[in-house]
Each structure stands twice: as C-alpha cells, then as structure tokens.
Amino acid sequence: MNKAILITGIAGTGKSAVCDELAKLGHKAFGIEDIDGLFTMVHKKTGKPFKDYDNDNLEKVKQADWVCDKKKLQRLMSKNSNGLVFYNGTAANLDDLLPLFDKIFLLKVSQRVLRERLSTRTSNDFARTAEVQKWVFSRKTQWENHLIKKGAIAIDASRSLNEIASDIIKRSKSSQ
C-alpha cells in the first residue's frame, strides 16, 4: 500500500507534534514547512520574497503568503513513495497541493485550546501576539469548512498525541 497522507490544520492545532508522534511510531513523516527551500514567505502584491516579514506584526502577516514550491514537494514525494508516508504542513497555495495526496486530515481544536497552545508554544513564533491570534481566529471556521468541502477528514486534535496518531493511521489504511 503506497499512500501520501497530508496532515494540516490552522496554526497551533498540533501538526508538528502529530508528525513527530507518527515518526516515533515508525512511520515516514515529514514536516514539510521545516524543509529548507520548500516554502517561501512572499508578499501578496508582488509575489516576491518578503524581505522584512515579522510574525508578530499583524499588518505584515496580512500582506504575506506562505507558499510551498509544488515541484519541489513533488520531487520529495517521488523519492518517498513506498508505503504509508505522512506530510504535515499548511500553505497559502494548499488547494493547488491537495491533488498530490491520497488523503487529507484536518486537525481541529476549539478556540480556547487553540489560544492556549498559541500563547504557550515554543516551537514556532507565529500567532504569539493577541492581535495576530484574533486574526487567526477570524479565519479559522471558514478555512476549516473550505478544507472539509475539498475532502479533508476532520480530526479532533484535543486528544492525546497517541490517540490522534492512531486514528490517522487507522483511517489512512482504510479504503474510504
């Protein structure tokens, strides 16, 4: 069984932690946002790399897109096509990337849990400020609903990492 599985979600839902858990369980799992050269922060108006981007500055956050290089992602995927392979991340051009995957899992948590995670996480500085968090929350429901309409399978990410990973593995192996 060869399957490419995407695990995505809004900032703070636990994508990286779930990816790490899947790797601990012996699966191939890639945090694609952490791979050098695969993503670029671009200015929405120019499409060029954003020179002075700042995760804490709401105006700059609103002007930027986090874009994945589809061709580079395809090369990574072609080198890792044996068995069940997990990729985690999100991108402004996610709709363009979705057809590359056999299944898409959307990690979801409540706004309360999300606020707590964003405020206390140390692995990533995106949405640390209350101002940027408010902006993230304003987009959360619409973005999640959009992905579900595109075929993403919603996963309750407020559970333990082991429960989440086990659920994703089980559903990844099923034909539905």
PLM features: residue spans?
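Conserved phosphate-donor/acceptor-positioning beta-strand/loop module used by diverse small-molecule
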Residues: L100-R121
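Glycine-rich phosphate-binding loop used to anchor ATP phosphates in small-molecule kinases
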Residues: K60-L100, K108
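The Walker A (P-loop) glycine that initiates the GxxxxGKT/S ATP-binding motif of P-loop NTPases
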Residues: G9
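Small-molecule kinase domains that catalyze NTP-dependent phosphoryl transfer to phosphate-bearing small molecules
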Residues: L94, T120-D167, S175
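ATP-binding Walker
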Residues: T13
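Walker A/P-loop
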Residues: S16
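Conserved substrate/cofactor phosphate-moiety recognition/catalytic segment
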Residues: D20-K71
